[in-house]
A protein has these predicted regions:
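Conserved C-terminal active-site "lid" loop/helix of NAD(P)H-dependent oxidoreductases
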Residues: 2-34
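Amphipathic terminal alpha-helices
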Residues: 28, 39-70
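N-terminal juxtamembrane segment and adjoining first transmembrane helix
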Residues: 61-72, 193, 371, 375
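Conserved beta-strand/short-helix segments
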Residues: 71-75, 79, 120, 124, ...
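Membrane-interfacial helix-loop segments of redox and metal-homeostasis proteins
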Residues: 90, 96, 101-105, 145-146, ...
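Central hydrophobic cores of alpha-helical transmembrane segments
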Residues: 130-137, 437-444
Length: 491
């Protein structure tokens, strides 16, 4: 749009009637009164728009309009951030022992939050700068290896609140009426229920990873594990874990927290109003989801131990991948349409499109049905559930059947891959991914005869498992929703 920010007054029905022009007949005024209009809208409107675009703030001031109510949003979130900056400066030295570098980082961050929050009252870019300071505040305890749990928690909490009040709170309540669904879709992938399901899972993952990080940073002495005893300790102190320059569990906690924050940024049309945020949101979830499974694969193969909380956190991250994919696909379709119409994809990617457009009507659901729909696992077909169970069986087979050597490693790795592929394919838009399980099944047909370390009956068990995996993943399963042009890819 030409106006800065979003205009809450433009509605689709206004666009529909905008072509209904009525030309006034001024011939009698000319003939009887000799009157002619001094200004022409056709000539004046381009000049008005040029003046608005060149200096929006001055244009609003000259015309006695309130630009802040149109673009910047309310002032109270930025005032709260100023108070949070004061809190950070005033409490950092009262929380106990703190590393000098982290102390100066917190003091500088508090001052920066106050300064840029004041600027954010008039400049939108300053709010995003405050957001960046909040991100640094959440990351600093990891970079400086905070030995004080209170300091770490204080920085995490203040950083998350600063991001919330800088860029999330000012946008709340600005959703226009309408479904917000992309063209050809039967639901809105950016709907609040869809995103809140991811936020809920992200917070579960955050608390799990934060607990594991507490052990790595020295905040607790002994990590709790209900099934594998000292396995968690050995995993968290392994060479794989120490290869990271920071606490890998703390890095996971930060990733989960960013997922939760990114999940609530933007309106219900952010698939087209904030494409960059949707892509960033997908990058926060999809690559870490795959990486977490890789780390789980390395536990028994490279370390020789299991970690219960690590497994649960990985499952949580994996469950977040499916509901995040559809929003990324919707944004990809939007950018592709922009390219086909000749628009600058780079500009559209960063600025989005806030103009009114025809939106498909979507089926209304009850709150419970909407919640179940937002979590893909509840609508996954039976064959993918069985494939997941096969993957779990393969991961447990080395222990249950006393497999050793390369046979045990191969079986465990294939099992983890099958679980990953099956859970990702729970999402209808990602259903073609299930075909990778057929390759895993084919590998099982061969691996039992190639590697050594199995029991006498293992080759036949591997063959039966591989054939079952191939058979289960031939079927796509029912596709209940519509996904525009992506429908052809699913089938």
């Amino acid at each position: 749009t030409l106006l800065p920010g979003s205009d809450p007054f433009i509605k689709p029905w206004m666009i529909d009637i905008s072509d209904d022009h009525y030309a006034l007949d001024i011939s009698r005024a000319r003939a009887l009164l000799g009157w002619n209009p001094r200004h022409s809208l056709r000539e004046t409107l381009p000049k008005m728009l040029t003046a608005l675009q060149s200096d929006p703030v001055e244009w609003y001031r000259e015309n006695e309009l309130h630009a802040q109510t149109v673009s910047d949003g309310p002032a109270w979130p930025h005032v709260i951030n100023m108070l949070l900056g004061l809190w950070l400066i005033g409490t950092v030295q009262a929380l106990g022992t703190i590393e000098p570098s982290l102390l100066w980082s917190d003091l500088a961050s508090g001052a920066a939050i106050i300064l840029f929050s004041m600027l954010a009252l008039r400049h939108t870019w300053a709010a995003w700068t405050v957001c960046g300071v909040g991100f640094w505040l959440m990351s600093a305890p990891l970079l400086f290896w905070a030995s004080n749990a209170a300091v770490y928690n204080n920085d995490l909490l203040v950083g998350a609140l600063v991001v919330t009040f800088a860029v999330i709170a000012p946008q709340l309540g600005r959703d226009d009426p309408g479904s917000g669904a992309p063209p050809g879709w039967s639901y809105n992938p950016s709907g609040w229920m869809q995103r809140l399901a991811i936020v809920f899972l992200a917070m579960i993952g955050f608390f799990l990873a934060r607990y594991l990080a507490a052990f790595q940073l020295g905040h607790i002495v002994h990590p709790w594990d209900p099934f594998f005893g000292e396995g968690t300790r050995r995993v968290l102190t392994s060479d794989v874990s120490k290869a990271f320059p920071v606490s890998d569990a703390g890095l996971g906690a930060l990733s989960y927290l960013l997922d939760a924050l990114a999940g609530v940024i933007g309106d219900v049309r952010r698939w087209r109003t904030m494409p960059w945020m949707v892509v960033l949101f997908g990058l926060f979830i999809i690559p870490p989801g795959v990486t977490s499974i890789v780390l789980v694969i390395l536990q028994p193969v490279g370390i020789g131990d299991w970690c219960t909380l690590c497994l649960v956190a990985s499952v949580v991250m994996l469950l977040m991948v499916s509901p995040a994919l559809d929003e990324v696909i919707a944004t990809g379709q939007f950018l592709l349409r922009a390219r086909r119409t000749g628009a600058s994809v780079w500009r559209v990617f960063w600025q989005g499109e806030r103009g009114a457009m025809d939106e498909p009507k979507i089926q209304s659901r009850s709150l419970l049905a909407e919640m179940l729909h937002s979590i893909e696992a509840f609508s996954a077909p039976w064959n993918l559930w069985l494939s997941t169970m096969v993957g779990v069986w393969l991961m447990a087979a080395p222990t249950l059947l006393n497999l050793v050597g390369t046979t045990a490693d191969s079986t465990h790795i294939v099992g983890a891959l099958v679980v990953t592929v099956s859970v990702v394919a729970f999402a209808e838009p990602a259903r073609p991914v299930r075909l990778l399980n057929i390759l895993c099944g084919a590998w099982l047909l061969l691996a039992a005869w190639i590697f050594h370390g199995g029991t006498p009956g293992w080759p036949w068990i591997s063959i039966v498992t591989g054939l079952a995996l191939i058979a289960l993943n031939i079927r796509c399963g029912p596709i209940e929703d519509q996904y525009g042009d992506w429908q052809r890819v699913i089938r």
